[in-house]
Design a protein with these regions (language model features):
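Alpha-helix C-terminal capping segments
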Residues: 44-48, 177, 343-348, 375
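Immediate flanking context of iron-sulfur cluster ligation sites
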Residues: 1-8
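A short, conserved structural fragment
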Residues: 348-356
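Local cysteine-cluster metal-coordination motifs and their immediate loop/turn environment
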Residues: 9-20
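C-terminal scaffold of the Radical SAM
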Residues: 1, 22-46, 51-334
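Short amphipathic alpha-helical interaction segments
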Residues: 333-346
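Short, amphipathic alpha-helical interaction segments positioned at domain boundaries
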Residues: 363-376
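Minor-groove-contacting beta-hairpin "wing" of winged helix-turn-helix DNA-binding domains
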Residues: 357-361
Length: 376
């Protein structure tokens, strides 16, 4: 089975911290975009991609700028061209500032069964600093509207280590989220990515992010609070109630095949050692390629045995499932210890092995970027 990702690269206003590809809103462009996606799906079905999908993910950008009818038409094309398994997970990312009761009901009726709401924080001051369209009450209302619309699988984004954030403010956010009682939480520390307005603000001294000690305390504090309240910390930034992990993202971390549709989307073909392809982040070029029946993708990254092994370890150690020696032996002919003896030794305080399965502790996840380097 494979996953399907569809990129909807439109935003009413781009957040200053975001480095994902997006375009400004133009009604004509948005209205024509679903047809491009359907043409791209048709092309992919004739050029190497076949079989049913078990997960579909509408990401962005702001997918909730598309109408429920547009989403329904795209899902109909997916079923026609490929098929969806029974109980496929179908996720739509939504901005609380763009949803209404009517369109949430429409999304649910179209086949969307998992909603990812980008609330980020319930603090009005921090929402303003992050450049979000919504305020605290609109975020809370969007969640309630989603419940009324029939969504019983909702994920919320939580950002921490925000400029000027206090421990008390983060604790208040966590309490607000727990009161909402979502099935899933994606919790990210704010980082200043290159070529974003936030990066320019930080490097110029206009804005400062919390120091490493605050970040570490916040990461562990989020882990402790959510773990004590019934959430499984199953990946560095992901928490879920029992049976509510994000199946689509698990496919990424397990190096399963996925097809990317839309400007800026990536695909991964799992044949042999694997190949990653991308659609350039250029809407005009994407439109030209799709409308002329050409391949809109280009080669991004190829893998040999060594690079595939390193990526398998990199992705696996991000998760609580970890890395299995038996699976490495079957796929690569070695155990983790045999392949990376020095890296394993250097990670010993944070890397544990139980019955041939290697996992990082929560403290190890906090140090992930440093600990993983010797494995790459």
């Amino acid at each position: 089975m494979a996953g399907l990702y569809l990129h909807i690269p439109f935003c009413r206003r781009k957040c200053p911290y975001c480095d994902f590809y997006s375009e400004g809103v133009c009604d004509t462009t948005i209205q024509g975009y679903p047809d491009l996606l359907k043409q791209h799906l048709a092309w992919a079905s004739k050029h190497g991609w076949s079989g049913s999908f078990d997960t579909v993910y509408f990401g962005g950008g702001t997918p909730s700028l598309l109408s429920p009818k547009a989403i329904a038409d795209i899902l109909h094309t997916i079923k026609q061209r490929f098929g969806l398994i029974h109980n496929a997970e179908i996720t739509l990312e939504a901005n609380p500032g763009t949803v209404t009761q009517e369109n949430l009901v429409g999304y649910r009726n179209s086949g969307i069964n998992r909603l990812s709401l980008g609330i980020q924080t319930c603090n009005d001051k921090h929402l303003a600093n992050l450049g979000r369209l919504h305020d605290r009450q609109e975020g809370l209302d969007a969640f309630d509207l989603a419940r009324v619309a029939g969504f019983d699988n909702i994920s919320l984004d939580l950002m921490f280590a925000l400029p000027g954030q206090t421990e008390e403010e983060l604790e208040s956010d966590l309490n607000d989220y727990l009161e909402l009682d979502p099935e899933h939480l994606s919790c990210y520390g704010l980082t200043a990515e290159l070529e974003t307005p936030l990066y320019q603000q930080v490097t110029s001294g206009e804005m400062s992010l919390p120091d490493a000690d605050f970040y570490a305390d916040a990461f562990i504090g989020v882990h402790d609070k959510l773990s004590q309240n019934g959430y499984d910390h199953y990946e560095i930034a992901s928490y879920a109630k029992k049976g509510r992990t994000c199946r689509h993202n698990l496919g990424y971390w397990q190096r399963r095949a996925y097809l990317g549709i839309g400007a800026g989307a990536h695909s991964f073909c799992a044949k042999e050692w694997g190949e990653r392809r991308e659609v350039p982040s250029d809407l005009a070029a994407y439109r030209d390629a799709v409308c002329s029946g050409q391949d809109p993708t280009q080669h991004l990254e190829g893998f040999d045995r060594e690079s595939a092994l390193s990526e398998t370890v990199y992705l696996g150690l991000r998760t609580r499932r970890g890395v299995s020696d038996s699976e490495l032996q079957q796929r690569f002919g070695c155990t983790l210890q045999e392949a990376f003896p020095e890296a394993v030794a250097a990670s010993a305080p944070w890397l544990t092995c139980n019955n041939g399965r290697w996992t990082l502790t929560p403290a190890g996840w906090l140090l992930f970027d440093r600990l993983i380097l010797p494995f790459l």
